[in-house]
Amino acid sequence: MTNLAPIILFVYNRPKHTETVLNALKKNTLAKDSILYVFSDAAKKEKDFENVNQVRDIINKISGFKEVVVTQAETNLGCANSVISGITKVINKHGKAIIVEDDILTAPNFLEFMNEVLNKYEKDEYIFSISGYNVPMQVPESWKSPVFLTYRYSSWGWGTWKDRWNEADWDVLGWQEIFTDKTKNKLFRRGGDDLPYIFRAQMNGTMNSWAIRWYYNNYSKNRFTVFPTYSLVENIGFDGSGIHCGKAGKAPNKPVITQNGEKIDLPDALEFDEEMNKLFISRYKYTFKDKLRRFLKELLRYKINK
């Protein structure tokens, strides 16, 4: 395969996770032909110094890729700023990118899938990004495509193109309308009932997320993300070690799919399928109790951070 997208890996203070993620990436069939960019954020607190240095020891000895470019921040940028600036730098040079963070375990055919889809649908402007992750769901026997469209985004092993990325408004102007206009709130929730709560936390300053702002841009332009029918990644960060992922026994995860060598038969044109979308979004539907619990959680977080 030619015209491969570069891989971007963001790391911070988790040496064991970083090593595990790199080992999985190296087992990808296209790793040896791919350029890997690694962005290492500097320690925010003194207690993080040792782990950050251990991570940097690991990333400065990486092999198994066509080329490795390591960037080590001298001061702490924070997760959101690190990701936004890193992707912008690489994607403006290469035109597209595949992005992985230090808790995303990839299947051996992850890079093959991502490159195939990025190349296939680059000209389809209604597609905003590509995901390598999918939730556990009972796929109908009638569904034969390896991919489907949904309104939700994913930051668990994903890719996009320069033109889509550079359209993003990171200041999310007009965001208040999500909470004052019922129609817009309903449209925003097409990606999941959890998203308005995450978005409110971001805009209240109790969360610092690039991903929810990326979704806002996806929503505002009425675009889709391409998801694989079966997941090609597993998030190993639900152990309390991450910035945004705490401990969770019911993380929407799925074991990594390891089959390899099968040709990915992508349709020439993608159409939104309501049934597949309903199956997918059902993982993010809230009951009244869920909504009340989430509201109280965000209220408590807001009071603590005031």
Question: What is each PLM-predicted segment?
Answer:
Residues 1-99, 104-306:
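An acidic/histidine-cluster motif and surrounding catalytic segment
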